[in-house]
Amino acid sequence: MRYFSRRLALLVLPAMMLAGCDNQATTTSERGTLKISLADAPITFDAVNITFSEISAHINGQWITVRGQPMTVNLLEWNNGKSIVIGTSEVPAGHYTQIRLKIQDAEVVINGQTHPLEVPSGAQSGLKLAHEFTINAGSTYELVVDFDAQRSIVTTGPPNNPNGYKLNPTLRVVPKAMTGSISGIVTNPEHAAIAYAIAGIDTVTTTAVDKNSGYFMLAYLPVGTYTVALNDTIGRAFVKNDVNVVVGADQDLGMITLQ
């Protein structure tokens, strides 16, 4: 079933700032700041370490660098709506068409063992995420890039004894201003519970339930109606239909017991 995918998200936060920059010859009143943060995480590994070598945005036929220095992030540290800034730079105000993420290196840690995560040449030269957006002078615009980790990390070799791991990126982009969230507290979260937001037959996002507090947040959801499903490793589950998400608000489901 498709709702058993895990996801992580990249949060793109362009915000207006008035200061000089060398990326393009524009006046300070024509510039903004593009900030890119990493949020949410896959939850089938001990760690997923991704090294980004460059992050950029496309405007008027050229790429504007948002981050030009390598940065390694353990994706598992960012979950339940938390995010980390992985790039920020002043950029020209105007109409953008793409975000580009260059991945230099990657590895996964499973049961304490570190395995290289094979990065395709396309990811090294740049994952281009097509999404048109405009940064207006004096305004703020935010994007969320949702990276489906479960479908993006594939194994090679026998299913029960894999001999390698490959990165096959699957991503989606949504404007943050048009999103909301769903949260709750699981009363019995000790067996690696997972929460899913499902629209129709498609899993929109997934998050791990905190093992100690039982808290979870399905963040950056487009406005709409969702089915919320939870399960754990011993087969207990919970399903709630017709959960409405509205702009800028969190839909709190309260206390949930898996059965």
Place the predicted regions along the sequence by residue.
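C-terminal motif of bacterial Sec signal peptides marking the signal peptidase cleavage site
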Residues: M17-G20
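Bacterial N-terminal signal peptides that target proteins for export
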Residues: M1-L10
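A short, solvent-exposed, low-complexity linear motif enriched for acidic/polar residues
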Residues: D22-V243, V247-Q259
